[in-house]
Amino acid sequence: MANNTWKLIATTALISVFSTQLAKSVWKEYKLSCAANKNKTVSRPRQYDDHLFREQLARNYAFLGEEGMRKIKEQYIVIVGAGEVGSWVCTMLIRSGCQKIMIIDPENISIDSLNTHCCAVLSDIGKPKVQCLKEHLSKIAPWSEIKARAKAWTKENSHDLIFADGESPTFIVDCLDNLESKVDLLEYAHHNKIDVISSMGVATKSDPTRVSINDISMTEFDPISRCVRRKLRKRGIATGISVVFSNEMLDPRRDDILSPIDCEHRAINAVRDEALRHLPELGTMPGIFGLSIATWILTKVSGYPMKENEVKNRLKFYDSILETFQKQMARLNENKERSSLLGLEEVGYIVEEMFRGKSPISGYSTKLALTKWEANKEISLTNVVLMTKEEQEIHEKRILLDGEKLTAVYSEEVLDFIERLFKEEEYYS
């Protein structure tokens, strides 16, 4: 009897030790698994009844139809920048039925994020923006697959980051506030033939009725759009990029905020400083930009009838201006090789980006021509000026043939303005 009791005690002890060791082993494995998965940022879609999905999105189904909603569900959209504009884009795409998105942003929520971010709260301060969005959106749309990447997008890591899982995005949304990275991303999407839309500047804007979406070539009255457009033209991209922008000009009654001239100057400085955070902005405007982008994507991919982007195509106009320059070069007996340095692309750039489509002398925008500016300098972007044909004739005779000084022909104001444009071009070059 006693012997059996000891056997029972020994067996119980062995089982207890084995169970303890097993529990420790399982716990250790669990901790290792947690550590390994700590940095994984993919939210897998949970099972969600299709009837509930349809009920939740009943109004979208009524508006866009069965086929339109099917197309939206099939999209894989990459949003680069999860801050003041990007957070609204992500939220409304997921709320509207998109089932797969990737969010890319290296930054954390800060206290000033609460002014413009779509869903961040005080307790989110210090948390990665992508994690904040993923947690919030997973509660709204448990069917969604959200890939959150707390990394900076760069030219060097672009392919590995966007195509990390071997999947090709159907759309890229640019919400970056670093202008160099913004231009790099737009160039990347354009060259890889991925549909893209970009958010331009919300700074100094306050009129929601002036916000519109169009091709980059059609933007106006927005210094940030102009900076981006000009940099893209330098890379051979004049059209084919959709952007949301505001054509609102700063009200002169608010010159205490920023004068129109200073606005352009500060925008160019923002390019040099790489970020757009140096300009004053109204907290509601980023949301309007983000909602506009989300709406545009939803209607575009679903096939809902919408107005197509206009594209500025003035090749015939540029060709006629180029002809005036080539004829001048022939009259001056300039080396043909030198005069051929300017083609239609360069002429378009000079006309639209450097001189804003008008003569710096008279301000006229009709009967335009190009002329060599200084007789003793080589042909280059900083020695060619846009002016009217009549002004070209006078300039050619007095400056290029008779050898008069520029100061004898033009006012100090005109010369300073042209010199400023040339210095600006030197920066972009």
UniProtKB/Swiss-Prot annotation:
Q: Give me the segments passing through the membrane.
A: 3-23, 74-94, 279-299
InterPro entries listed in its UniProt record: ThiF/MoeB/HesA (IPR045886), ThiF_NAD_FAD-bd (IPR000594), Ubiquitin-activating_enz (IPR035985)
Gene3D superfamilies found in the cross-reference section: NAD(P)-binding Rossmann-like Domain
Q: How does it sit in the membrane?
A: Multi-pass membrane protein
Q: Which GO terms describe its molecular function?
A: ATP binding; tRNA threonylcarbamoyladenosine dehydratase; ubiquitin-like modifier activating enzyme activity
Cite a GO CC annotation: mitochondrial outer membrane
Q: Where in the cell is it found?
A: Mitochondrion outer membrane
Example GO biological process term? Answer: cyclic threonylcarbamoyladenosine biosynthetic process
What keywords appear on the UniProt entry? ATP-binding, Ligase, Membrane, Mitochondrion, Mitochondrion outer membrane, Nucleotide-binding, Phosphoprotein, Transmembrane, Transmembrane helix
Modified residues annotated as Phosphoserine in this record: S259
Q: Please name the top-level EC class of this enzyme.
A: ligase
Q: Which Pfam families does the protein's record reference?
A: ThiF (PF00899)
EC number(s): the record gives: 6.1.-.-
Instruction: Kindly give any further remark recorded in the entry.
Output: Present with 8430 molecules/cell in log phase SD medium.
The job of this chain, per UniProt, is described as:
Catalyzes the ATP-dependent dehydration of threonylcarbamoyladenosine at position 37 (t(6)A37) to form cyclic t(6)A37 (ct(6)A37) in tRNAs that read codons beginning with adenine.
Task: Indicate the family of this protein.
Answer: Belongs to the HesA/MoeB/ThiF family.
Name of the protein in question? tRNA threonylcarbamoyladenosine dehydratase 1
Species per Swiss-Prot/TrEMBL record: Saccharomyces cerevisiae (strain ATCC 204508 / S288c) (Baker's yeast)
Give the classification, highest ranks.
Eukaryota, Fungi, Dikarya, Ascomycota, Saccharomycotina
Q: Which gene codes for it?
A: TCD1
